[in-house]
Regions:
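A nucleotide-sugar donor-handling region in carbohydrate enzymes
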Residues: 18-22, 163-164, 169-238
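A short, glycine/small-residue-rich beta-strand->loop->alpha-helix junction that serves as a flexible
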Residues: 38-51
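Donor-nucleotide binding loops and adjacent catalytic segments primarily
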Residues: 54, 215-287
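Conserved nucleotide-sugar donor-binding subdomain of glycosyltransferases
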Residues: 99-132, 139-140
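A donor-sugar binding/catalytic signature common to diverse glycosyltransferases
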Residues: 132-136, 154, 280-320
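Catalytic binding pocket for nucleotide-activated donors in carbohydrate/polymer assembly enzymes
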Residues: 296-297, 301-353
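C-terminal amphipathic helix plus adjacent low-complexity
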Residues: 344-395
Length: 395
């Protein structure tokens, strides 16, 4: 457990949020297990992945979800028992993470968010009595698992940063070390790490870490890829104005998401995000231009779309995705692309497409969802046995 988390737990205990103060008691395990799910709200990738998992879990379990930001708004439209909390947000400027502003904003909001979130989450958890907590890189559900002593499952892509062996160019070493520190401070000592990824570096601790293909939506599986003349552009933030000027130099039609507007500017068509519309554009696109976000890259790869990746600077997870994307031959990675870079990419689309078709394999989410079902059964059975033994000792 990191010093940061110890401080947070100490703070919660001294503010009356300890497990003894809460008088938390576990209910006997019934046929349907009760799962509390925490979802990070940075971008929509965490929400999209969690949406698939939650839908699966609800077939045999009861699920209560806590999420912030865009994840909350996405999930509340799809499920009941979704509650809003506050969370950490990254500040972007000119397609670059502003680490100073991100840190200062987080420090400023943390004391109030800590109190409000843990109080609200515990009030609901006291009634719901979860047997297991699952976190898709959500900080407060991680803390709650420690306070309540409920088994924690980490399920995300983010831990590929800390729990896989990643060799990167020296110029990204500082970003790597910083990212590792942040990731380790968010989630501590879960029972197991389930990592989703389109690349498979060696695991640092195979006994507690398992890696699976990306979790994809049913709608993606149902799409029929075509090869029309437009190129899809998706941006994590609307700060990359340099890219917009670059695209104007080409004869292609670019359909652009991430700038929060509906507008046509020459060969550029800006669109607000709409799931159905996005699916259609993605499936029929010639290629995809994006940052290094895991979800869009994974969906594009599944649909055999070559990818031109410009990861947000200082965002190491995106940088790592882009490095492996290029290494696998699925597309190209550029920090600061110019016209020649994009021209080269467009000339080699057939090569990248063949590489994807030859090498990428997906199992329809079967392995990871099956693993999750087994884990839930094992952990709840073990928890029930421990509670029975403890009760016998008391009597």
């Amino acid at each position: 457990m990191t010093d940061y988390t110890k401080d947070m737990l100490y703070y919660s205990e001294n503010k009356g949020l300890g497990s003894e103060k809460f008088n938390y008691k576990f209910s006997p395990i019934k046929e349907r297990k009760r799962i509390l799910y925490g979802v990070c709200g940075e971008g929509v990738g965490h929400a999209i992945r969690s949406g698939v998992v939650i839908k699966h879990l609800l077939e045999k379990n009861d699920v209560t979800t806590f999420a912030h930001g865009r994840a909350y708004h996405y999930l509340r439209k799809k499920f009941n028992n979704v509650y809003q909390i506050e969370g950490f947000n990254t500040v972007y400027e000119s397609n670059k993470v502003n680490s100073t502003k991100t840190l200062l904003n987080g420090i400023k909001d943390l004391p109030q968010d800590l109190m409000n979130n843990l109080t609200a989450m515990y009030d609901i958890a006291k009634t719901f009595a979860p047997h297991i907590i699952i976190s898709d890189f959500e900080f407060y559900s991680n803390l709650l698992s420690k306070i309540l002593r409920v088994p924690l499952i980490s399920l995300d892509h983010t831990h590929v940063v800390t729990h896989c062996e990643n060799k990167v160019p020296i110029k990204y070493l500082k970003d790597k070390l910083k990212a590792e520190g942040v990731v380790r401070s968010f989630i501590q000592l879960p029972t197991i790490y389930l990592i989703t990824s389109f690349f498979y570096p060696p695991l640092t601790n195979p006994e507690r870490v398992k890696i699976f293909p990306p979790i994809l939506r049913k709608e993606i599986f149902e799409l029929k890829p075509e090869n029309e003349e437009h190129i899809l552009v998706y941006q994590t933030s609307d700060s990359n104005l340099k890219l917009i000027e670059l695209l104007k130099e080409f004869d292609y039609n670019f359909i652009i998401y991430g700038f929060y507007k509906e507008e046509i500017d020459g060969n550029l068509s800006f669109r607000n995000f709409n799931e159905v519309g996005f699916f259609d554009v993605l499936a029929s696109s010639k290629a995809v231009i994006t940052n290094g976000g895991f979800n869009v890259i994974s969906e594009a790869i599944y649909l055999n779309k070559p990818i031109f990746s410009m990861p947000v600077k200082k965002q190491f997870e995106q940088i790592l995705n882009a490095i492996h994307l290029e290494k696998l031959g699925y597309g190209e990675f550029h920090d600061d692309p110019d016209k020649a870079d994009l021209e080269k990419f467009l000339l080699n689309l057939d090569i990248y497409k063949k590489n994807i078709q030859s090498n990428f394999v997906h199992d329809g989410n079967h392995a990871i969802l099956q693993e999750l079902d087994v884990l839930i059964e094992e952990l709840t059975t073990k928890s029930s046995q421990i509670n029975t033994v403890n009760k016998a000792k008391i009597t």
